[in-house]
Curated annotation (Swiss-Prot):
Transmembrane parts of this sequence: 14-54
Cellular component aspect of the GO annotation: mitochondrial inner membrane
Alphabetized InterPro entries for the sequence: Cytochrome_c_oxidase_VIc, Cytochrome_c_oxidase_VIc/VIIs, Cytochrome_c_oxidase_VIc_sf
Keyword annotations from UniProtKB, A to Z: Membrane, Mitochondrion, Mitochondrion inner membrane, Transmembrane, Transmembrane helix
Gene name, Swiss-Prot/TrEMBL: COX6C
Protein name, UniProt field: Cytochrome c oxidase subunit 6C
Mitochondrial matrix side: 1-13
Amino acid sequence: MASEVLAKPQMRGLLARRLRIHMVGAFLISLGVAALYKFGVAEPRKKAYADFYKNYSPEKDFEEMKKAGVFRSIK
C-alpha cells in the first residue's frame, strides 16, 4: 500500500461562503414573491376597485338601502 498525502480540507470561511450563497438565493426568492404578489394580487385588486367606483353612485345606493329599511331613522 502506498501512502498518499491527503489534501487538507478548507476550514476557514465555510460559514461565510455558505451564508453568502443562501443570502443571494433568499433575496432573489423574496423579489420573486414580491413581484408575484404585486402582479397577481395587488394590481387586479386595484383594477377591481377602480372599475367598481367608476360606475358607483352613492345616492343610488342610499336610496336602495332606504327602500330596504336599513335605516330606522329615515322614512
